[in-house]
Structure formats: structure tokens, C-alpha cells
Curated annotation (Swiss-Prot):
EC number of the protein: 2.2.1.2
Gene behind this protein: tal
UniProt-listed GO biological process terms: carbohydrate metabolic process; pentose-phosphate shunt
InterPro entries: Aldolase_TIM, TAL/FSA, Transaldolase_1, Transaldolase_AS
Pathway: Carbohydrate degradation; pentose phosphate pathway; D-glyceraldehyde 3-phosphate and beta-D-fructose 6-phosphate from D-ribose 5-phosphate and D-xylulose 5-phosphate (non-oxidative stage): step 2/3
Catalytic residues of the enzyme: K131
Keywords: Cytoplasm, Pentose shunt, Schiff base, Transferase
Upper classification of the organism: Bacteria, Pseudomonadati, Pseudomonadota, Gammaproteobacteria, Cellvibrionales
Record HAMAP family: Transaldolase_1
Statement: the UniProt record of this protein carries the keyword Amino-acid biosynthesis: no
Family (UniProt): Belongs to the transaldolase family. Type 1 subfamily.
Protein's name in the database: Transaldolase
Protein localization: Cytoplasm
Length: 318
């Protein structure tokens, strides 16, 4: 029998959640996703050292030191993306600086800049997804960018009302997190072990998937942040799944049978349509302790690694 990875590819678009060129070459995903943490990790790999220097040199004409570091990190993120696009037939996701998560206009400006860097590298915007945090401001930025033909990937999505607001905004794709939701429930409840079917992250993505299909939304659901292959198997059939190299390897080595779980034709129990105003969005997020805490934690984590990356670039430039 073929591997579970090959079986999964029959009904789900498999995406590599990494900046590791060798892993992408090995597992042949459709797309790849990056984030500030993955770019920082990739920046320490031997194969990207020349690109670090190119990224720094490309920003030297900027006199303001903070702006110079920001520009160099943008150059690096896009440079890594350009290398990855030589290997994947689909798209690369590149993230807007997480420090802009609550600034709609600055997020739009940064997204346009990233797209311009890709275009200078010979890549059309149709092969790029701009990643934005699923804050109210991030969703509004995505709504405007989508109208300009810049497709977006809304990340750090933990709550149902975040998903509903993204769909209403017409964003191209969302990345609801699975493993980080599980982490929260393990840390904040007495239950420490979950079967895949009852895993709260799996339950969340299934609900979002069924809601989108029931109400005819075209927004792609791409499950993300997996802790084990059981979570992946429980979401087989989801539009897309972005998976780390370690879990891609486990799926590739497992020759067992994989059954499709999610399908547009099997939409589950009816879910009433949710219309988000800014007030209802913020209140709904506030009432969901898990989503509130994990969104804030996720933004802080990406900001930390963005700063770490800029410090790495700064030390290398000296």
C-alpha cells in the first residue's frame, strides 16, 4: 500500500510548513508556508548564508537603522520564498511583520512591499499568499488587499468568530491552528489526553470547514500547527493541510490505510450564519479565553522571532 502521505494527497492539498529546502525537495508539497519563526530558523541554515549577505546589502541605502533592518528581513523572507518557489508548483506564504498586527494601513503597505519584492524577483503575485494575523485589523487589511488581487492567508486563527469574519471579508485562505488549541486545553483543564476525534483543535477545524461548505464560502481552509499525525488523519479531506517536515516524514513512512473524513458533500449539522461587526467580533474573541490567549501569545512569539532575526542581521552586517 502507498504511504499515508501519498493517500492524503489524493483528497487534500499538502503544504510544507518549513523554510527547509531539502525537506521540500524530499516531500514534494503543492505549496509552502513560512512565518517569522521559520524564517529565523532558516536564516541559521548553511544554505541561506549567502542570501543573508545579499539581503543586508540590498538594504544598505536606507539610513534609518530600524528601517534598514526591517527592509533586510523583508529581503530575506522574500529571498527564501523565491528559492522555495523553484521547487513547489503552487504558492509560498510570506508573513507581514507581526508588530503590525493591529495596524490595518501599515499591514497593507507592508503586504504591497512584499509583493513588489517578489515581482522584482520575477514572480507574479498569483504565486504568493500574504500572511496576516487574524485580528480585526488584519482581516480588514486582507479585505482590501484581496480587492487588489493580492491573495491572503489569515493565520493565528483560533476562534470561530475569527473564521466567520475572514469568510465575510472574502479572504483567499485561513490557517486555523490545531495543535496550539490542544496545548491550551491540556494546560488549562484537567484532561491531559485526547483521542483524535475529540481533540479540541480537530473539532474546531471540522466546525469551520463544515460552516464554510454549508454557507458556500470559497475561502480555503488550511489546517495548521499539528502535534501528531492523528490530528492530520482526523482532518483528511480538508482543503489543505500545512505540515512540518517531521510529521511529513511520519506520514511518508506509515503504510496503513487513510480514510477521508471531511468532504464538501458531508457538511455535518447545520450551523447558523454568523455576521461579525467590529463590536461583536471583539466581544466574541474576548469571551473565548483560549482564542484570546493563543492569539496574543502567537503574536508575541512572532514578534520575538522577528526581533531575533533583525538582531542576527544586525550582527552579521557589522
Amino acid at each position: 500500500m502507498t504511504s499515508k502521505l501519498e493517500q492524503l494527497k489524493q483528497f487534500t492539498d499538502v503544504v510544507a510548513d518549513t523554510g527547509d529546502i531539502e525537506a521540500i525537495r524530499l516531500y514534494k508539497p503543492l505549496d509552502a508556508t513560512t512565518n517569522p519563526s521559520l524564517v529565523y530558523k532558516a536564516a541559521q541554515m548553511p544554505q541561506y548564508q549567502a542570501l543573508l549577505d545579499t539581503s543586508i546589502n540590498g538594504a544598505k541605502s536606507i539610513t534609518n537603522s530600524a528601517e534598514q533592518l526591517s527592509a533586510a528581513s523583508d529581503n530575506l523572507a522574500v529571498g527564501i520564498g523565491l528559492e522555495i518557489l523553484k521547487l513547489v508548483p503552487g504558492r509560498i506564504s510570506t508573513e507581514v511583520d507581526a508588530r503590525l498586527s493591529f495596524d490595518t494601513n501599515a499591514s497593507i503597505a507592508k503586504a504591497r512591499h512584499l509583493i513588489s519584492l517578489y515581482e522584482k524577483g520575477g514572480v507574479d503575485k498569483s504565486r504568493v499568499l500574504i500572511k496576516l494575523a487574524s485580528t480585526w485589523e488584519g482581516i480588514r487589511a486582507a479585505e482590501i488587499l484581496e480587492k487588489e488581487g493580492i491573495n491572503c492567508n489569515l493565520t493565528l486563527l483560533f476562534g470561530f468568530n475569527q473564521a466567520a469574519a475572514c469568510a465575510d471579508a472574502g479572504v483567499f485562505l485561513i490557517s486555523p491552528f490545531v495543535g496550539r488549541i490542544l496545548d491550551w486545553y491540556k494546560a488549562n483543564t484537567n484532561k491531559k489526553e485526547y483521542a483524535a476525534e475529540e481533540d479540541p483543535g480537530v473539532v474546531s477545524v471540522r466546525r469551520i470547514y463544515n460552516y464554510y461548505k454549508q454557507h458556500g464560502y470559497n475561502t480555503v481552509v488550511m489546517g495548521a500547527s499539528f502535534r501528531n499525525i492523528g490530528e492530520i488523519e482526523a482532518l483528511a479531506g480538508c482543503d489543505r493541510l500545512t505540515i512540518s517536515p517531521q510529521l511529513l516524514q511520519e506520514l511518508d513512512q506509515d503504510k496503513g490505510e487513510l480514510k477521508r473524513v471531511l468532504s464538501p458533500d458531508n457538511r455535518g449539522e447545520a450551523i447558523a450564519k454568523l455576521i461579525d461587526t467590529e463590536a461583536s467580533f471583539r466581544f466574541g474573541l474576548n469571551q473565548d479565553a483560549m482564542a484570546t490567549e493563543k492569539l496574543a501569545e502567537g503574536i508575541r512569539g512572532f514578534v520575538k522571532d522577528q526581533i531575533n532575526l533583525e538582531n542576527l542581521l544586525k550582527s552579521r552586517a557589522q
